Structure formats: C-alpha cells, structure tokens
Amino acid sequence: RSLVAELGDARSYASRLRDYGGVGRDQVEWVIARLRADPQSRSATITTFEPLIDTTYIPCVSMLDFWAPAGSLELVVYAHSIDFGSKGYGNLVQLAAIQQEVASALGLEVGSLTFVIKSAHVYDTEFDYMRGVLAHSS
C-alpha cells in the first residue's frame, strides 16, 4: 500500500485506483473490460473514495468517468478541491496518462478530458511561485 504522509498516511491515488479497498481490484483494468464488453457504456465510472476508511480525509479527485461516444475515449473527472499551486498540473498529467492507457488498450483515439472542480485554489504560500510560473509561460 502506498501511503501519503502529508495527508495523514492516507492511501495514494495510485493505490486507490489500482488496489481499491486493498483487495487487489484494479479499477482501471475494470474500466477497460467494461468498455471492451460494451463500447457504448455510460457507466464506466470509478472512484478514489473509500468510505470504509476515508473518515477524515476525502480524496480531492474523487471520480473518473470514461466513455467512448464516437470512437474516441472521453474522460470526465470530478474533484471537490484542487490545489493548483503545487498539485493541479501533476493531477492533470496523471489523469491524461490514465486516459491514454485506457484508450490504447481499447484501440481508441484520446478524446477530451474535462475536469470539474468545485474549489480550485492556490495557497498564500505559493503565490510567488505561481507568479513566476505565469511570468515564464507567456
């Protein structure tokens, strides 16, 4: 099990997706099997939330919903909160990698990745860092 110390030893996203509940259930492989069996499925949905153990920490990225409406794999992700100062970019990169993995396994093109975020924020301690990032991106 991969634990994240800064989150009070909560399970990592990787372990939540690849070993859901600590019982060896790989949810990404489940999505691939589901869409392989029914390419039009609208319920290839997985979660990082583990209600039996998540009593104080709720994962920020909580739901990944895959579908292939027209030959490309679309991914909609829901997050209740994202720290864009230090974690948002890494989250997006990893979500895109998972989308690519599923699309490749199914022989599909990668479609859009939609990220629905209830609370996107930057902490005060990261303002200077973010100003530097923005200054170099233009």
Question: PLM features: what roles do these ranges have?
Answer:
Residues R1-S138:
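Terminal, non-catalytic protein-protein interaction segments that mediate quaternary/complex assembly
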